[in-house]
Amino acid sequence: MAADQAFEGEHIVAPSSSPDDVLRVEHIAKSFGATTALRDVNLHLKKGEVLGLLGDNGAGKSTLIKILCGFQKPDGGSMWLKGEPFAPKSVDDARAHGIDTVFQDLALVDQLSVYHNLFLHRERVSKPIPFLSNRVMRREARKALDEIGINIPSIDVPAARLSGGQRQAIAVARTISGDADIVLLDEPLAAMGAKEGAMILDLIQRLREEGNVSIIMILHNYVHVFAACDRVSLIQDGVIAFDRPTAETSVDELTEIVVEEYRRARQAASIGNGAGATPKPDPGTRDPGAAAPGPAEA
């Protein structure tokens, strides 16, 4: 479908939510001083679904993730978790309700062993774990890693000795072992090589096939979206500009949509700043496997 056919008015109309949504947000807005990060975000997530969130740097992706996990509070809008109104007071509150997040910094303690890292933060949720011996923690850690297919040579080594992909896998395993129903992944493939990226994509694919955990993850590479996601949403200028099952779209269409949205935003900025405004580079000349550049994320 051509970009000019896909648009209705300013933005593509996202499909309506349904009663079986595990998470639903409506009209979420967030500003930082004079900077608007999110204008009017509407999003839904079904049980077992993997949603890929795309957008330029500065489009509002990370801000949305931080609101969903309770790290930041929205200025307006509503959220529902399993059909009930939901307004997390903190990251710990969101975790206690089954929403866990893997941020880019991962929050692993380099000096601690793999198995110790797997049990970090578990004591903060509504069901704290009792005191466990190292023997029990080793056994439970190995069981958790085996269940989701993560191959770590030794769970006794400090986290500092793990590769980037292994660290990311441990962080994801920790959220799953903590009984999370919804996992938010903030750029899980950032700065990874092909082998490490494949490890994380394989892990996400296995979780997707099991269908027990719903996932929202920020991605920049369109190929990764189609390899691991059931649905893709494009956030642009603080709103969801495109939302569609990956089976019903393609890399080419997604690229065309992104370029068209970028040109619309550039044209609007030029009108707002006057005819003398300096245009930004056209993303149409870039590799379609990566999103267009932009300012730093708010």
What are these regions (language model features)?
Residues 3-274, 297-298:
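Glycine-rich phosphate-binding loops of nucleotide-dependent enzymes
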Residues 286-298:
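Long, low-complexity, intrinsically disordered segments
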